[in-house]
């Protein structure tokens, strides 16, 4: 299969400015294509996983992936899909976040100097040096305010009578300039992004064609939700991060292990590298034994993100906990100051401290609802004092919230 054929087959396709022509060009030659990422956290999460898999697919077919870190545009904030202005972040935050994002991406794609090796650029490199009057003179006449006002990112905010600052309104101009700059300096001919970016992408393609007469394209992916309508990347416990310093490989495994039944075949197609033949076998397995299929899905996706050994460890830990009732030290672990446990800490405070509840009131509610266990024993008194007498032989205390969330406490 060609890049475009596999792109469509895997369910990544939503819209393209000229699919027939792009298909022809990518069959005949290798291109450079880019995807941009906000520089607002020290790791990407699974909400970006489809875009990452597309970068990987580009590289697989010999095309050059360009990753844009929005160091410049992050200072403004994209209004697309937002009800209010995003907080601006500092240069120091951007530098730290860029390092973490490259760590996330390096799990999936190869960076380097080769023809199909990925490169990562910060758009602050060219946006920070733009002179406002020069920009207006050279590019302002190519943008139609009438058209900009019809774009969903702007129109919806105005219809709801929500504040839209001139700062945010300029975001789409700068993103359009990114495409022009990458086309000129890196021979980039394709921008990819989520369907909410369609207006911005089309503006960039139009600007580039008008100024340089180059043939460029835009292509978008569908916005994904789970079968129940939840946004990809977030859970009640927080974001499903790709970097292990923010989320352990075991917890990453457990996210996929616990996904909704209706999602597993779709997720296998989107996020794994199973062949079409293997996907048919997987779909049959899901019809016969949904839990076995979930374990395979979780293993495959954890292996891709964290490596074979971590995926194997996560699988074994999950089996020990849920099928054999054992405690495994590969579980997420928090360390408490010895004095805290020696003096004793109430159950609700400990569950909050361990991250099994987002607030103390939620921890109380969890315990009252009979959803909390200490060392596999149900606790019903939220004020019960947990101290060193609860330490097991391996010097840990096992906390459980519901059937699927477990944490070890050490001192």
Swiss-Prot record:
EC number(s) given by UniProt: 6.1.1.1
Compartments reported by the entry: Cytoplasm
Lineage: Bacteria, Pseudomonadati, Pseudomonadota, Alphaproteobacteria, Rickettsiales
A Gene Ontology cellular-component term: cytosol
Subunit structure: Homodimer.
Name of the featured protein: Tyrosine--tRNA ligase
Keywords annotated in UniProt: Aminoacyl-tRNA synthetase, ATP-binding, Cytoplasm, Ligase, Nucleotide-binding, Protein biosynthesis, RNA-binding
Residue stretches spanning the membrane: none
Keyword Glycoprotein: no
Domain annotation S4 RNA-binding: ranges: 345-411
Family: Belongs to the class-I aminoacyl-tRNA synthetase family. TyrS type 1 subfamily.
MF (Gene Ontology): ATP binding; RNA binding; tyrosine-tRNA ligase activity
Annotated catalysed reactions: tRNA(Tyr) + L-tyrosine + ATP = L-tyrosyl-tRNA(Tyr) + AMP + diphosphate + H(+)
InterPro entries xref list: aa-tRNA-synth_Ic, Rossmann-like_a/b/a_fold, S4_RNA-bd_sf, Tyr-tRNA-ligase, Tyr-tRNA-ligase_bac-type, Tyr-tRNA-ligase_bac_1
Signal peptide feature range: none
Disulfide bonds: none
GO biological process: tyrosyl-tRNA aminoacylation
UniProt keyword Flavoprotein, yes or no: no
């Amino acid at each position: 299969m060609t890049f475009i054929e596999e792109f469509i087959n895997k369910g990544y396709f939503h819209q393209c400015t000229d699919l027939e022509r792009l298909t022809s060009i990518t069959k005949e030659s290798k291109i450079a294509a880019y995807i941009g990422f906000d520089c607002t956290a020290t790791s990407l999460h699974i909400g970006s996983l489809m875009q990452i898999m597309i970068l990987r697919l580009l590289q697989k077919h010999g095309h050059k992936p360009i990753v844009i870190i929005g160091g410049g545009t992050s200072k403004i904030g994209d209004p697309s899909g937002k009800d209010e202005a995003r907080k601006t972040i500092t240069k120091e935050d951007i530098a730290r976040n860029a390092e973490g994002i490259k760590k996330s991406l390096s799990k999936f794609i190869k960076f380097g100097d080769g023809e199909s090796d990925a490169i990562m650029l910060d758009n602050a490199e060219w946006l920070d040096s733009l002179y406002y009057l020069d920009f207006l003179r050279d590019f302002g006449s190519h943008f139609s305010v009438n058209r900009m006002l019809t774009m969903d990112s702007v129109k919806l905010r105005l219809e709801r009578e929500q504040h839209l600052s001139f700062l945010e309104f300029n975001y789409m101009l700068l993103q359009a300039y990114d495409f022009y700059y990458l086309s000129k300096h890196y021979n980039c001919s394709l921008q990819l992004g989520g369907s909410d970016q369609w207006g911005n992408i089309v503006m960039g393609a139009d600007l580039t064609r008008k100024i340089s007469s180059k043939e460029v394209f835009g292509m978008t992916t569908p916005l994904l939700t789970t079968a129940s309508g939840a946004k990809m990347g977030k859970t009640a416990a927080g974001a499903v991060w790709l970097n292990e310093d923010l989320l352990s490989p075991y917890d990453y495994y457990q996210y996929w292990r616990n996904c909704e039944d209706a999602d597993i075949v779709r997720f296998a197609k989107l996020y794994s590298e199973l062949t079409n033949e293997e996907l048919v076998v997987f779909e049959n397995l899901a019809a016969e034994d949904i839990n076995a299929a979930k374990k395979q899905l979780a293993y495959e996706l954890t292996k891709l993100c964290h490596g074979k050994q971590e995926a194997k460890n996560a699988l074994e830990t999950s089996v020990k906990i849920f099928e054999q009732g054992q405690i495994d030290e590969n579980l997420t672990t928090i360390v408490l100051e010895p004095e805290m446990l020696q003096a004793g800490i109430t159950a609700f405070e400990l569950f909050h401290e361990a991250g099994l509840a987002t607030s103390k009131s939620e921890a109380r509610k969890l315990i009252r609802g009979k959803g909390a266990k200490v060392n596999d024993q149900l606790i019903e008194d939220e004020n019960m004092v947990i101290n060193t007498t609860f330490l097991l032989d391996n010097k840990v205390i096992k906390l459980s919230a519901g059937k699927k969330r477990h944490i070890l406490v050490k001192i």
